[in-house]
């Protein structure tokens, strides 16, 4: 019965948002992807002690076993996010949403599609020929869905983001919910990854000229670069897509997931992350 109310379906949507920061407790599910991005890209090294989190080492050397746990957890976590977004969309398309105002349903659909596109974008960046399924695919067919290219993924990503860009509001009453300009920015990035430079340029021009944060602030550069990382500046004018977290819950260290290892080594009990000196700049970058 709860699933047939706006509050119930919104709770499922919030569950999809929660997958942004990981589901299965693996640090590789964190949204930063500094290992698969900066470390494999050459501008950073793992850092810390040689034996600490040694499963990162083969990833840096491009020797990772496809069956290794870290990347498998990234795969599982992102598909869990897809599944949660699909559940929202299935509920909105069914009888359960009949009592919800049409305009509210459209916004909820836009948020769910933006999230689904984000999860698929992460998957297509990390893996090849990923299976793609939307809210119409039955659970029985999910395990047999296959693909021989990334074309289907990009098609769905573009479709979802175009819908979100066209239907999401510029501002949101609850910070943390995505707005139309977050969708536009991710869509422009998707165009870049596909070498659709003309489409990306047109969209970036619109974002620069008109883009706003969900709080309504026009996109702008902060006066101090360090201010981007100051918690007191959450949802600042450079924040296009923020992943919100609770605080003072005692559930983890004082940092974004996986970034909590990257503070200076042995900063002590009162330090920002207690340890560990990961994610150090490489000589190549310097």
State where each predicted segment sits.
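An aromatic- and glycine-enriched ligand-binding surface/loop that stacks and positions planar moieties
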Residues: 1-52, 130, 162-165, 177-182, ...
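Short coil/linker segments at helix-helix boundaries
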Residues: 105, 129-150
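Alpha-solenoid helical repeat scaffolds
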Residues: 122, 126-129, 135, 193
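Conserved, well-structured interaction surfaces
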Residues: 6, 10-14, 18-24, 48-127, ...
């Amino acid at each position: 019965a709860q699933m047939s109310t706006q509050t119930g379906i919104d709770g499922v949507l919030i569950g999809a948002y929660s997958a942004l920061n990981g589901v299965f407790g693996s640090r590789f599910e964190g949204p930063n992807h500094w290992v698969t991005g900066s470390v494999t890209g050459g501008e950073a090294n793992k850092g810390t002690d040689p034996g600490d989190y040694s499963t990162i080492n083969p990833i840096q050397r491009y020797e990772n076993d496809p069956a290794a746990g870290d990347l498998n957890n990234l795969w599982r976590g992102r598909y869990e996010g897809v599944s949660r977004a699909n559940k929202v969309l299935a509920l909105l398309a069914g009888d359960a949403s009949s009592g919800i105002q049409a305009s509210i349903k459209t916004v909820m659909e836009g948020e769910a599609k933006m999230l689904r596109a984000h999860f698929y974008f992460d998957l297509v960046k990390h893996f090849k020929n990923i299976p793609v399924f939307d809210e119409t695919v039955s659970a029985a067919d999910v395990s047999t869905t296959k693909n021989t290219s990334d074309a289907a993924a990009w098609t769905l990503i573009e479709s979802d983001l175009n819908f979100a860009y066209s239907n999401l509001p510029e501002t949101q009453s609850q910070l943390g919910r995505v707005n139309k300009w977050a969708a536009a920015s991710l869509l422009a990035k998707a165009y870049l990854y596909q070498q659709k430079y003309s489409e990306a340029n047109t969209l970036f021009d619109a974002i620069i000229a008109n883009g706003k944060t969900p709080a309504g602030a026009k996109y702008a550069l902060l006066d101090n670069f360090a201010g981007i990382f100051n918690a007191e500046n959450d949802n600042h004018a450079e924040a296009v897509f923020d992943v919100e977290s609770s605080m003072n819950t005692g559930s983890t260290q004082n940092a974004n997931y996986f970034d909590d290892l990257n503070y200076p080594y042995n900063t002590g009990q009162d330090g920002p992350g207690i340890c560990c000196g990961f994610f150090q700049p490489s000589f190549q970058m310097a």
